[in-house]
Every structure is written in structure tokens, then in C-alpha cells.
Amino acid sequence: MNTVKTVRELRAAVARARGEGKRIGFVPTMGNLHSGHAALVTKAAQRADFVVASVFVNPLQFGANEDLDKYPRTLAADQERLVQAGCNLLFAPTVEEMYPDGMSVQTRVSVPQLSEGLCGASRPGHFEGVATVVNKLFNMVQPDLAVFGEKDYQQLAVIRAMVRDLNMPIQIIGEPTVRAEDGLALSSRNGYLTPEQRTAAPALYRTLQHIAAGIGRGQRDFAALVAEGLAQLSAAGFRPDYLEVRHAVSLRPAMIDDRDLVVIAAAYLGNTRLIDNLYLHVEEKTA
């Protein structure tokens, strides 16, 4: 695996691979990679002949009081993990390489509606930062396909909409969330948790499972199920940011006759914000 740090080197390496008739797969990351990221790269390697990954902690998607400065940067370990997962090329640019004129004058990409609410409500500007950097990376790499984790469910929906609305010839593949044995979704931010918080953390996914089970049994009072879930989270030591049942594609609030739903949540354990979601398909009842 080669590592490049400039757009020029990146484009030259991708052009060589494309010249050999190779299909290009792409996995954008912020580094501090874990098994969940490795699964994304493995999926890309299954679907493409040449896999590009990027490691870039994107300042544009962090709010003023968020964890940009303390977000872990572990490039050497990331390189090892990428090699093992089947990556061919790593793009690890500086902020100056990505935003040469500074971020204040950077053209922005905004995906309306899907970016609002849920994480967008408590992290204003976050999805604009995500859409902008992913758009730039797509233009730099020009992949045939890109793989994203379903753990960041709203982000995946935003990127799918951007690709569709801007007519990008890129196949977007969602990869199921990778979990620890106790159910906690793998996340770079799990490293912030104290041992006690780590023990409590799986309650987030259990709460989603509880709500999904209720819906599966035919309950349609989503507000009552969510109220139960919020009580469960608070009892486990969480400060919930949001917990909602949404339509799985449009992310609008769920309606009684919706078949494809997602139970989606963000909650704080101490200062660490964890997110998770659970998709479910509701079978139509036959008389």
C-alpha cells in the first residue's frame, strides 16, 4: 500500500490504476481506525479492484465546542490496519492540502431536509461539513463505488441524497454496523469512555432493541415506546440527545402505516456522545 499526501499524487496513482482497467473503490475515514472501518475496506476490496482510503480529520464538520483537538490521530496504526484489510492506496492530506484558501472561503455543499433534525439539530453545520469534504474527496478520487458505515445512518442518507441530486456516477454501499460482543457499536469515540461508562454503554443498543421489539409486536404508539426508551437510557446513566422512530429512507417522523423504519438515537455518557440506530422492516399483517 502506498501513502500519498497531495491531490496530485493521489490523482496520478488512481489514473494509473484506472489505466489498467481497474474498478476504483473508496472509503473515506477520519482515522483512529477499528474493526468497523476494516469491514468497510474489506467490502470495497470485494467490489472493486483498487481500493483507496482517506484519513483526514475534517475541521469543517466539527462544531466550536466539539472534540476536534482531542480526536485521536493514529496514522501508523491506521496504515497497518488498512494494509491488513486490503487497501491499495492511502490518501492522508493536511488541512492546507484540502482547504488551500482556508475554510472561511470554501465553497460549501448543503443537503437540505435530511441534514436537519436528529444529529443536525444538535450539531449545526455538521452535515454541511461532511457533504463538502466528501464531495471534494469524490472529485479527487473519482471512484466507481464508495463504502460507508450504517452506524452513521443520517450521514449515509445525506451522502446518498448528494450523490443522487448532483448526478455523481458513484455507487454508494452501506455496510452494517460492527459491534462489540456486548452490542456496543464500534466507534473511535468509545475510547473516551471510562471503564464504568464502557460497562453502561451497551444500554443504548438494548434500548433500540426494546423499541424495535415493541414495534415488531404490533405497537404503534411510537411516542409511548420512545418515552419508555428515554427512561431506560436515563436509568443507565445516559443524557439523551434524541431518541426517535423515523421512516428509514426519508428520515421524516414515522407514521403508523410505514413499513421501513429506523430507531435512531444519540446520547451522552459523561462528555462522550454516542450514536446508534436499528433498522426494521414491518411486515404487513394479512387478515
From Swiss-Prot:
Disulfide bonds listed in the record: none
Matching CDD domains: PanC
Binding site for beta-alanine: Q61
Catalytic reactions on record: (R)-pantoate + beta-alanine + ATP = (R)-pantothenate + AMP + diphosphate + H(+)
Annotated EC: 6.3.2.1
Gene3D superfamilies in alphabetical order: HUPs, Pantoate-beta-alanine ligase, C-terminal domain
Family to which the UniProt record says this protein belongs: Belongs to the pantothenate synthetase family.
General remark: The reaction proceeds by a bi uni uni bi ping pong mechanism.
Quaternary structure, from the entry: Homodimer.
Listed name of the protein: Pantothenate synthetase
Organism field: Pseudomonas putida (strain ATCC 700007 / DSM 6899 / JCM 31910 / BCRC 17059 / LMG 24140 / F1)
Gene: panC
